[in-house]
Amino acid sequence: MQLLEGHIQHYAWGSHDVIARMTERAAPTTEPEAELWLGAHEAAPSRLLGDGAQGHLDALVAADPQRVLGDLAARFGGRLPFLLKVLAPVQALSIQAHPSAAEAASAPAGTYGDGWAKPEAWYALTDFEVFAGLRPFDDTRALAELLDVEALTGHVAAATAASEPARALLATLLHLSADEQADLADAVVEACRPLAPAEPALDAVVRIAEQHPRDIGLVVLLTMRHVVLRPGDYAFVDAGVLHAGVRGVVVEILANSDNVVRAGLTPKHIDVDELLRIADLDRQIEPERGVLDEGWTCFPASTPYFRLRTATLAPDTLPVPGEDQPRILFALDAPVEVVGSGATVRVAPGQGCFLEAGEQAYVRAVAPDGAVSDAPRPRVFLAAPGEA
């Protein structure tokens, strides 16, 4: 077992207090803190903590993948297949889609950093506002008519005759000149303003326009479903699904990859052709609740890369499942102890504990002085490989 310190990503859209408070540091922070990564991705691997510990989790895995990963070493090329994050946006993220493994492997050289798919899933810690998946095209057409922006209704009408109207409309919007995109975004936002108080999706577009003025992504958002995940909701986001987080706090579990293509709300390059190639415009996200199994709330994912479980700890000990697999346990709200064969690791809120394949362990709540306690009751999240 190894105590882990997550890596904080200071993206501009992040909160100045959420992750700091979660990890028991002073807030507000000078820099924004957007994401906390727990895993072995080479871009931001977790640091190993504890007596005699040195280095980072990626190096630990690479030194002996067969021991650390067990039977998964060959299947995933010696890489830990999952990555666990906390996302804390106070501004909208870019509109994104991620490739399947086949799409990543067949893309032109340099498009992606690796040949992996990048499905992901969110567990909401607070209300989490997001745009994800597309509206039915008839709904997009009705919304365009309601907004009555001539350029937009013209683009929608032209796309209607296509075999895939939604894809045709997306292609049209993203292939407009920069000036045409900016003018259309301005006109659409102004048309949204009087309707925004009664329409949450339009209200979100108006708010996001303050963060990303004149961005074509504001128009793309109108073609997407507006969803608010409630605390405890879980949503699986498969490869190809367009999505953009807006605000809130989630635990995110994903394949151990950073492959991404963007569709707006970003100053970064938009690879329109690749986006149109990989975007799955029919698939949606469906918020769900997990199933209780031996003290853990378990969430399914139709992917071999990851599976998420969570539990709120009582005074009793709770066995950590999946002993034949590598796992990361993440603590929130109060410290916990992970007890293994001959070793005990104390995990503070915001820290993680890595368990190698073959390691048996259980977890229990502890008071700051080490005594077993039932208040406050910590929450733990367990990231493990999937079973698909």
What are these regions (language model features)?
Residues M224-V237, V241-G245, G340-A361:
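Short acidic-glycine-tyrosine-enriched beta hairpin
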Residues V249-C298:
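C-terminal, non-catalytic macromolecule-binding modules
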Residues R193-E210, T297-P300, P315-Q325:
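Short beta-strand/loop turn elements enriched in aromatics
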Residues M1-P197, P267, V272-I285, L308:
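Transition-metal
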Residues L93-Q96, P119-V130, G248-P267, F306, ...:
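A short hydrophobic beta-strand segment most commonly corresponding to one strand
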Residues D179-L221:
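Active-site cores enriched in adjacent His and Asp/Glu residues with nearby glycine-rich loops
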